[in-house]
Amino acid sequence: MSGILTRWRQLGRRYFWPHLLLGMVAASFGLPALSNAAEPNTPAKATASNHDQSVKVNFSQLALLEASNRRPNFTVDYWHQHAIRTVIRHLSFAMAPQTLPVVEESSPLQAHHIALLNTLSAMLTQEGTPPTIVRRVARAHFTPQASFSVPAWISQAQGIRAGPQRLS
C-alpha cells in the first residue's frame, strides 16, 4: 500500500503539478484581469452582439485601437506571478545542461537553450512593471553641413580619413 502512495506522490510531483501550473499560466495569458466588482451576467445574445461590434473595425480606426488601453484594469496578481515564476523555474531546471558545454562541441540547439535560459533567469530576477505609453520622445537635433565633401562623408560613414582634408 505504501508503494502505491509513493508512486502516486512521485507522479503528482513530477507530472501533475508542473503541468497544472503550466496550464494555468497559459490559460491566463491574454485574458483581462478580473476586477473586484463583478458585472452581472448578460444574456448570450448581448454578448455575441458586443463581440461582433468589436470585430468590425475600419482601417481608419487602427490608430485609435493602438492608442487605446488594452488592459484597462491591470492588476498584479500575486498567485499568478507565483505560478509564472514556478513554471519558469521548472523550465530552467529542465533545460539546464547536465554537463558543462565544451566550446568545440557547441551546436545551434545548445546556443538556443543557453539563450533561453538567460532570458528565463532575467525574467525571474527583474521586477515586473506594467507597460507604460511614452507620450513624448526627445528628438535629436540634426545640423546639416554647409557643403558636401566625399572625404568627410567617407570618414563619417566608415570611420577613416580618406585623403587630405582640404584640396589646395
Curated annotation (Swiss-Prot):
Keywords: Cytoplasm, Periplasm, Signal
Principal location: cytoplasm
Record's signal peptide: 1-37
Pfam families in alphabetical order: SecM
One GO CC term, this protein: periplasmic space
Compartmental location: Cytoplasm, Cytosol; Periplasm
Presence of keyword Membrane: no
Record InterPro entries: SecM (IPR009502)
Any one Gene Ontology molecular-function term assigned to this protein's record: translation regulator activity
Similarity comment text for this entry: Belongs to the SecM family.
Job of this protein: Regulates secA expression by translational coupling of the secM secA operon. Translational pausing at a specific Pro residue 5 residues before the end of the protein may allow disruption of a mRNA repressor helix that normally suppresses secA translation initiation.
Name of the protein in question: Secretion monitor
